[in-house]
Amino acid sequence: MIYKGLLYKDLFLLKESFPIVALAVLFLLFSITLGFTGGFLALCIMLMVFAVKVVESTLIYDETDGWDSFVLTAPVSRKEIVRSKYLLQILFLTGAFLISAVILLLISLIPVFSGEEWLFLMLVVGFCYALVYGAVMIPIYLKFGQHTSRYVAFAVLIVVAGLYGATFGFTMFLEFAASTIPLLIGVLVLSLAAYGVSYSISQKIYAKREF
């Protein structure tokens, strides 16, 4: 019940951002009609990055409005607050991934898009790197606040984008040979491990934070 209330609060704050998601989906559908599979993949990745960054928005709202000091007067623990942020991020990111995967599956049935299986692989890689970006940014926002973290977020996003591009080039070089699957599994395991470490760090940071 506590998590439901915390998630509802964050969703209420984010309601003005939902039209942006709808606009991204429209661009995505537009790219499909033009046959731009590469553009489709880029928009899918952007959608997942946006899904991750929504938690950054809630952290900024909380800091600006002094929500943390207020909610801690209620029967809500600091661990539950941090946990709700990670849960919200996972829900949004998983939702963005599933939406992209379903649409990709549907368009793969269209003859003009046949032979584009590599998009599925890169979508999974994009999910992993979006997860890593979220894992890095939540503890940074909790530790340094919104002003410093905004610059760090931009730098981290550039690094993650570079890693994604490098993985994309390496995967294309392999031409999706059998060694591609172990690569994807390795990236997924590392991203999940990073997320687990991030959660532990965030809990320690928030437990010591003064309001």
Kindly give the residue locations of the regions a language model identified.
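Short helix-to-coil transition segments within interhelical loops
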Residues: 72-78
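Alpha-helix N-cap/helix-start motif at helix boundaries, enriched for small hydrophobics
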Residues: 80-82
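Hydrophobic alpha-helical transmembrane segments of membrane proteins
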Residues: 1-66, 84-211
